[in-house]
Each structure stands twice: as structure tokens, then as C-alpha cells.
Amino acid sequence: GPMGPSGPRGFQGPPGEPGEPGASGPMGPRGPPGPPGKNGDDGEAGKPGRPGERGPPGPQGARGIPGTAGIPGMKGHRGFSGIDGAKGDAGPAGPKGEPGSPGENGAPGQMGPRGIPGERGRPGPTGPAGARGNDGATGAAGPPGPTGPAGPPGFPGAVGAKGEAGPQGARGSEGPQGVRGEPGPPGPAGAAGPAGNPGADGQPGAKGANGAPGIAGAPGFPGARGPSGPQGPSGPPGPKGNSGEPGAPGSKGDAGAKGEPGPTGVQGPPGPAGEEGKRGAGEPGPTGIPGPPGERGGPGSRGFPGADGVAGPKGPAGERGAPGPAGPKGSPGEAGRPGEAGIPGAKGITGSPGSPGPDGKTGPPGPAGQDGRPGPPGPPGARGQAGVMGFPGPKGAAGEPGKAGERGVPGPPGAVGPAGKDGEAGAQGPPGSAGPAGERGEQGPAGSPGFQGIPGPAGPPGESGKPGEQGVPGDIGAPGPSGARGERGFPGERGVQGPPGPAGPRGAGDAGAPGAPGSQGAPGIQGMPGERGAAGIPGPKGDRGDAGPKGADGSPGKDGVRGITGPIGPPGPAGAPGDKGESGPSGPAGPTGARGAPGDRGEPGPPGPAGFAGPPGADGQPGAKGEPGDAGAKGDAGPAGPAGPTGPPGPIGNVGAPGPKGARGSAGPPGATGFPGAAGRVGPPGPAGNAGPPGPPGPVGKKGPRGETGPAGRPGEVGPPGPPGPAGEKGSPGSDGPAGAPGTPGPQGIAGQRGVVGIPGQRGERGFPGIPGPSGEPGKQGPSGASGERGPPGPIGPPGIAGPPGESGREGAPGAEGSPGRDGSPGPKGDRGEAGPAGPPGAPGAPGAPGPVGPAGKSGDRGETGPAGPAGPIGPTGARGPAGPQGPRGDKGETGEQGDRGFSGIQGPPGPPGSPGEQGPAGASGPAGPRGPPGSAGAPGKDGINGIPGPIGPPGPRGRTGPAGPRGPPGPPGAPGPPGPP
């Protein structure tokens, strides 16, 4: 029979239940690289090591050979005073004593006042973009938002194209009704024959038997897609899927290019000296840069002579050294003891005074007389002129370093230091590979799109999910473009100084440059008088010197007439430096300085790092309704269906006369159920369905393995030395340095003219020790001595002026996870699901009598599409389909503009004082400076107050007897003596 018209198009079903959430998507692109770090500030130089204690004195040199005793002269008149003997040669130098053991470290002093902060350096040029940062952990899914109100019903879909009518069969002749045969098996479909001409209307034949159901034809091509209807309400969220397996870590990316170091800022003035801690047992730190020389301290007050110390143990006798250079000429010896009075002779006749005879030749020097007893000390002589400054002696050998002292008790924590500059960013870790894709769920029936509802109010914040494991870092992205240069913000307050770090190991560098020579120490205490030397061997007679200026007659002394002042002797050797003076009391704390004006505005800093990704935006408004598509073209006629099976031939009846046309018979009873049809073929994919509602957020991925630690940044460059700080308060005199080497002997003075020998007076009584003379002119500065003991620290001064703001700190750690964002925009349209299995065939009607197969009729026009039927019930949720292939990674977004710098916070209170740093090794002694020109002689000082008499020293070695001077003219005859005894 002819093909019936197409049924009405069904209504669009209600939206299906959302499928299970898909597997976690691929990891997002890496964030833009952070700005390059800045080099850290140079650390403070180590403190100089404490010098070891002075070693015990070496053994005393061997005593010189005593001179030969002279033959005693004959008793007679008292002889003339002998010429002063020359000073004996200096004994050989004793061996060098063993170096002393290091002294105990002093108790840590209080912390010094805080230094004035240095000026802030200009920011360095912007370095190349650093390596890309790791992706942040995926946030946990928030609770679903409230369901919006249901949208209005959608518009009916577009009317589908009119289907083609099947070929109209030719009406067969009415045959006799045969016996109903058993339905045969469905035969193969034959090829459709060409359409025949319409024949004349025949008589209605008997109803033929129902044919076997034909094979389902291929579905027609999809019609043009109608306009999208409004979006329906979102369905309830599906159950949460299982977390995917963590991906394997990917290969390590290349390290980013190293940024150029910025210029080093100007170094601030040196801070105050911290407390001196006890020397630790660790390796000493690298030698610090020598600081600027301090101001020269004023001369200290003369201390009282100390008591004789306990003699140290005698060291082993050293090898006899080479004889030292000849010492300077000694001072004249005391007059000899007057001889005993001879027996007075008889008084002679007083003769007339004779004329003075010519000077006789100088006789050979007589034998040296025995030394007389030392006479009483004479009155203190006038202060002589300052001698010529001697050349500095050779530099002594450096002593062996002292042993390391025990580690001291850690001091109180030091003040918090300024925040260091950011170091360079390390190389990024390797990227991780994407995890395995989950199975894809079957597509549910497409719902009728409703209008977009008004966004509902935000739901209550959900509980924070457990933080996901850290994802594997992704590949290093290309460096992004530099952001716009932002305006410089207000200077921030200086941050609290951080605690000092632990002492680092001793560096392997060479010793630093020698330090500047130290300031001259205070004059030492006057030494004890030396022992009187033994009489030396008389030397050869010297040439007669030029006549010296005649001195003024002295006032008559108690012990006799004062002789003529002799010439000025050569300068003596420089005295050994005295002991260290006591530290003076700490000065009062200075007034609090006024707060300085804010500094100039600095250069804008480098662009800041890209911020974290913001929450997904709210759903956009629905798009405008699209234009209706063009009507599809009429499809080509399909191939003719196969011919049905030929029925069994009926019995041949007699040909009767044609009767009148009968009325149309009524429908027969329903036929028996036919055989099940063959399975339908899979049709071509239908058109893409409408976008479903957005699915709930996917589960939080498991924490990936920890990325490899990037290489450590290179150490910053050492900055140039800063300007010298302001001069501090004048400190107390430091300890005296070690004794300098003996100076070279000065030129020998011109011998003065021998004065007239006065009449020896009676031996006077021994007088009191004279008062100490005034201090001489300060000598030239000797080589730098070892560092003295550190004095107690002064009180902590007032807080300094607030410095310029510090550099921006490192980027803080990510904060806690925020509340989940709103549902994202709808995802892309899913693939169409596979066609379901064909349903069972309907019950066939009662078979009619088979008629002959007529020719195929022409295709009629397709009927109009009927109205859509009511929506059927929602089917169950299909199984989850396999996940689609991973899409390509999106392009990297542009770097946002740098935000304005925030206002500076209020400066916090200063932190507690930090622990003192470890004591550094002592710096190498600097070379001796060039000798300066001799200073002008100072004015003679006033007589000082009588000092406390010092202890009398042991007698010095006996000096040699000097050569005999020229014989003087004979004196006038003496008065006659008293008569002798009978």
C-alpha cells in the first residue's frame, strides 16, 4: 500500500540529568615569570681577632766582660777628675721568647648604639624575566549555587523538511482469496523495479497477507538546525567522580636566563660596634675590610708605677745571636773617690810666682783607677733640647697565631637587621605530564533550552577542602613582555632588623689588604734606672774636638762647684710602649635626634609578579537569537526498495463474468505477530545537540610529587665601601702597643772643650730622688701594634633617624584557599551518543490474500509535519562516556599592569638586641708607613709634681773607662799646710 504521511515531530524532551563530572582538565598554563631578585646586601665584616698575651721575657743576655783592673796610683794629691768612660757595648740580644697563649675573651659588652641607616640605592635596571612559576593547586569545588527560577517554555522547534513519499504501488486485480499459507521466512529484498504507469482502477482485491517487515532504511540527512531555544534551568549536580591518578613528573625544563645584577647601592655609614663575644671554636670568617682609621686619642694621664710582677719561668737559653749594633754614647760617669790626704810636708819658702810654662805634651794614658763609690745624686739638671728623631727600627717578625679560645656563651639576641634584597629566582622544576583521561559518559537527551535565569544570591561558603597535593610544575613559558612602569609609591618605614645568621665557615680567600696604621699610644711609664756597668777597657785617644760653647757658671751646689755643661748627647732609643690605660667611663647618651624629612621619591621599581588567577566570572547574558537557517534543498530520491517475496500461486479459478464493483470491505482482524525484524544499521551521526547545563566543578586532583629544588642563586657582588660614618665620641686611650725595635744610633755629638777642673768639694749626703721630668715630645708613630683589649661598650644611644624604606620583600606565600567561585560558563557541546538498539517490531495485522506485485508507483509529496507530542519521561542517566582528547594548551595571557605601590605601614618598635657575632680573625699587620719629617722642638714643659719615688733598680753593668783627656794647665800653688806632728 502507499506509504503513510510522516508522524508529527515530537516535543523536545526535558533536560537530561547532568552526567558525572569529567576527569580533571589539563594543567593550566604557567603564570608569568616573577621579577628578578635583587642582590642581597653585603654582610658585615668580621671583627678583628684578639691579640694573644705577650710572651714571657727572654733570658737576660750574658754580662759583658769586665775591664781589667788598673794599677792603683800612688798616694798623693788628689788627681784631676778623669774623663768619662765610653759606654760599654751592648750585650747580645737574648733569644726570642715563646709566643704567649691566647688570653681569655672578655665578657661580651653591651650593644652599641644603632647606626644611621644609609641612603637607599637607586633600583637597578629591570633584569630579564625570571623563570615561570609553578601552577597553583586546584581549588576545591564549592557547593552548588541555588537553582534559578524555571525559564519560560521554549519556542517549538522548526518544522522539519517534508519527507518524500514512497512509491505508490499499482492496484492489483482482485483474485480469489487463497488459503492462508504459513508465513515463509523473509527473503532477501530484491531490487526495486522502475515505476510503472498508473493502471486503471481495478476491483478491490482481497487483502493480502502482511509481508515480512522490511529492513529499516537509512535515516535521512539531518534537516537544517532550528534556532536555539532559551536555556532551561540547570539540573542538580551529579555525583562527584573519583580523583584521577597523579600524572608522572615531566622532564626538567631549561633554566631561565640569569638576570643582570643591579647596581650596588651606596654603602651606609658603619653601624656601631657590637658586643665582643667569646671566640667560637668554628673556623674564623673571612678577613674584613679595614675600617677608616679612628681619631687619635689624647695622651692619657700618667699612671702610678706598678709593683714588680712575679718573674716568669726562665726560658731555655737561646743560641747566641749576632752582636747588635753599637749603642749610643753613655752618659758621663760620676767623679771618682778622692784620694787620702798625704802627709803634709814642711812649709817651704814662699817663692815668687813663676810665669806659666808652655803646655807640656800629653803623656801616655795612665792606668785606670779603681772605680770610686757612687756619689750622692746631684740636683736634677735642666731639661735638654729634644734630640733628633731616630730612624724606625726594622720590623719584628710576626708572632705565631695564638690558640683558639673556647667558644663563648652566646650573647643576647642582636637587633633585627634590615631586610635583605630579594635573591634571584631559582630555575623552575620540570613540568608534569597530564593524568590519564577518564571514561566518557553517554550523552543524555538534550533538554529544551530555557532563557537564562537571573543569577541567584551567592550560596554560603563551603567548607574548605583539604589542600590538594602540589602539582607537578609545568614547562617554562616564554618570558612575557615587560609591564608598564608604575608610579613609585610612598617610601615605606624601615623594617625590623632580622636576627643575625649563624657564622659561616672560614672563606678560602687570601688575606686582605693590610690595615691602616693605628694611632700612637700614650707614653709609657718611666723605666727603672739601670745597673751600673763594669768598667770598660779604655779606648784610644780621640782627636781633639772643636771648641764648644762655654756654658754659664752654675750656682754653687752643696757638694761642690758645678761644672760646665757638656754638649748635648745623641738621642736615646725610643722607650717601650706603656701598658694599656684603664678605659674611661662611658659618656652620657646623646639627645634624641629629630626625625628627618622623608627622602626623595625613588625610581619606580620593576614590574611586580603576575597576580593569581581571579575567580571565574558570572555567566554571561544569553546571546541574541540567531537568524533562521535557509530551508534545506530537497534530497535526491532514494534507491528503490527491494522487491518483496513472491507469494505462493493460488488455484486457478474459472473466469467469471465481471461482477459489479463491490463496496469497500471493512478492515480485517489484526494479524498475528510477525517475526522480529533484523537489527537496524547504525545511522550517520545526527546534528550536534544543544549545549547542556554547566557541570559541577571537578574533584580536586591529588597532590603531585614535589618538584626538584632549583639551583641556588649566585651570591651578590660585593658593593663598594661606604662613606665613612660620623665621628663617634672620643674614646679612652687604648693599650700601648708592643715595644718598637731599637732605633739606629744617632750621629756622635761634637766633643766639648774640657772645662776647668774645680776644686773637689766634700762629699755630700745622698739626696732624695729627683722629681720626674716632664714628658718628652711624642715620638714618631711606630709600626701598628696588635689590637688591644676592647673596652666596655658605651650606653645605647637614642634611636637614629628613620631611614628610607627598604626594598620590597619577597612575594608572600599563597594564602588559604578562597571560597569557590560561581559555576563556570557552559562547556563545549559534547559528541552525540551512539544510537540505541532498535525496538521490537509492532504486532502485524492479519495477513490478507497475497496479490500480485504491481509496478512501483511514483513518489508522492511528503506530508506536513504534525504538532509535537507531549514530552516523554526523563530517561535514566547514561553511563559515563570516555573522556575526549586533551585540547591544546591555550596561549599565554598578557602580563597585567603593575599596581600602585601601597602606603607604608607604621614603623614598628625596634626589636630586641641581637646576639653578638663571632669574633673574626685578626687582620694582617700593615706595612710601616714612610718616615715623616722631624717635628719642631716643643717648648720646654713646666716642672711636674713630684711623683711617687720608684723602686731603686739593680746596679747596671759597669761602663768602660774613657780615654784620658788632655792635661790641663797647672793650678795655683796651694796654701801651706799645718805643721806636722813632731
From Swiss-Prot:
Keyword list, A-Z: Calcium, Collagen, Extinct organism protein, Extracellular matrix, Hydroxylation, Phosphoprotein, Repeat, Secreted
Full protein name: Collagen alpha-1(I) chain
PANTHER family on file: COLLAGEN ALPHA (PTHR24023), COLLAGEN ALPHA-2(I) CHAIN (PTHR24023:SF568)
Biological process terms in GO annotation: extracellular matrix organization
Primary location class: secreted
Compositional bias per record (Low complexity), positions renumbered to this chain: 8-27, 89-105, 128-141, 189-228, 304-335, 347-373, 382-401, 425-437, 513-526, 583-597, 610-640, 666-682, 727-751, 874-888, 916-940
Family: Belongs to the fibrillar collagen family.
Compositional bias annotation for Basic and acidic residues: 39-53, 889-900
GO cellular component annotations of the record: collagen type I trimer; extracellular space
Described function: Type I collagen is a member of group I collagen (fibrillar forming collagen).
Taxonomic source organism: Toxodon sp
